[in-house]
Regions:
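Conserved SAM-binding loop of SAM-dependent methyltransferases across substrates and taxa
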Residues: 94-106
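Helix-to-beta-strand junctions that scaffold the AdoMet/dcAdoMet cofactor pocket
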Residues: 105, 171-172, 188-190
Length: 237
């Protein structure tokens, strides 16, 4: 039976770590017996970094295989579910949050938007997200749109819940991130909730939501290997 595959986050970073570890080992082994002091010193420095690289690789594997699913469930557990909600996942990638929300719905629907850049996630495509939805048995409860978080193709007050994990920091400017938060506030229904997780800029997000009249009800940190993630929860009155 096929299993869903939610990819490797920031695959270029992982590749750099792997290559650095391999290069360090190769360099150290190749020049270990050299009499040239400069080479010995360089080999010593590189080899000293190998354990750190190995630890980072193990932490990344832990995140890909275990921790990001726990973090998804943590986020989804921060709001009660009736089953009829309209949900939006901003930066859905291969659909982790979108599908997780869809599995909590009965008559509701879960939407995902993204621009699907390969550098953000391995095999980061709409097709991969829909394949996961099919495998998870929620194909009829999800819908994907190719859209930027700063300009969403939805009317005001469309969603009961907006979710996002490790997405908004990819917007390169503070104004751009604030624009994304304004869009999240705009598409939320009165009484709706935004649950936004990231490793940076979360104070900006909370401030932007408050400027839209939203109440920031929680802002907490979680160590999710290999990152410290913060969750901002904001409610629209």
């Amino acid at each position: 039976m096929a299993k869903p595959n939610y990819g490797i986050d920031n695959p270029r970073f992982g590749l750099i770590i792997v290559l650095a570890v391999v290069a360090g080992l190769a360099f150290g082994l190749g020049f270990r017996k050299s009499s040239i002091e400069a080479v010995r010193a360089a080999a010593s420095i590189i080899l000293s970094l190998v354990p750190t690289g190995i630890i980072l690789i193990l932490l990344m594997v832990s995140y890909v295989k275990v921790e990001k699913f726990r973090h998804r469930d943590r986020m989804l557990g921060m709001t009660p579910w009736r089953g009829d909600e309209q949900v939006l996942d901003v930066g859905t990638g291969r659909g982790l949050l979108m599908i997780g929300a869809a599995k909590r719905l009965t008559s509701g629907k879960s939407f995902g938007i993204d621009i699907w850049r390969e550098r953000d996630l391995s095999d980061n495509t709409q097709e991969a997200a829909m394949r996961n939805a099919e495998i998870e048995g929620v194909r009829d409860k999800v819908e994907l749109r190719n859209a930027d978080a700063r300009e969403m193709p939805f009317p005001d007050g469309t969603f009961d819940c907006v979710l996002s994990n490790l997405c908004l920091h990819n917007t390169p400017t503070q104004e751009g991130r604030a624009a994304a938060c304004r869009e999240i506030a705009r598409v939320l229904k009165p009484g709706g909730v935004a649950i936004i997780s990231d490793f940076t800029h979360t104070d900006e997000y909370a401030k932007a939501f408050r400027e839209q009249g939203m109440e920031t009800t929680s802002s907490v940190s979680f160590l999710v290997a290999p990152m410290l993630l913060r969750i901002v929860k904001a409610s629209k009155s």
